[in-house]
Amino acid sequence: MKKCYLKIVSGTALAVMFLFASCHSAYEVTKAEGRMQPIDSTYDVAPDAEAMALLAPYKAKIDSMMYRVVGTAEMSMDKGAPESLLSNLVADVLRGAAAQVLGKPADMGLVNMGGLRNVLTEGPITCGNIYEILPFENSLCVVTLKGVYLKQLFESIAARGGEGVSGVKLRITKSGKLLGATVAGKPVVDDKLYTVATIDYLADGNSDMTALIQAEKRDCPPGATLRGLFMDYVEQQTAAGKKITSRMEGRIAVED
């Protein structure tokens, strides 16, 4: 996939503007030009030989780690709203990982689609594949919040068209309205406490998940990165002779 960045070709006038800004100069930018520069395998077809030689021993070591096969995916899994195989799987892993804090899975698992950056393809799973899917240093956070705020969380998920969830079922409209929600098949009770296993990024209220800020309690075990938890899950399933799989279960149903 080609990626682009904006390259300023004519920036002299801009530099002059900053230089004289404190003097209230009459200089003004009259023209700015730029072009899109594709950044792909053709951008630098002749790598620097000296740099390559310097990096070679490090690359060999990294490659030996990144290409290590840790499991097998039963099918290809991608992300996508309102529900997807990959987001269901990762949300399940988070929910199960809450056992290290609670002694049992959380009531709900939650991961944002934006945190899943690649496809898990059918076949061998390498460490590198997991880094491609989960490149961020997100960590497990288990938050405890009242049902009234859990409903607000569901409304935010509905407004975004769906996110990765586990342990709950939502009914939403195409326009992003919440029609109904259940936790473990039961309606949400406003004053009851519920546990949500998510990542620190969302627990901080990012990606519109502001309801999580209202948590009564927040537990974030040190060193429990989402990537590490997912790696552990894959290796545990593999040791048990199982392939990595997922299912579409109608966790978020869109109704007219």
What does each model-identified segment do?
Residues 64-81, 209-215:
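Acidic/histidine-rich, surface-exposed loop or edge segments in extracytoplasmic proteins
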Residues 19-22:
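C-terminal motif of bacterial Sec signal peptides marking the signal peptidase cleavage site
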Residues 32-54:
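Post-signal peptide N-terminal segment of mature Sec-exported envelope proteins
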Residues 2-13:
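Bacterial N-terminal signal peptides that target proteins for export
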Residues 84-85:
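A conserved active-site cap/scaffold subdomain adjacent to cofactor or substrate pockets
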Residues 47-74:
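N-terminal, Lys/Arg- and Ser/Thr-rich interaction peptides
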Residues 25-40, 89-91, 95-97, 103-109, ...:
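Feature captures C-terminal
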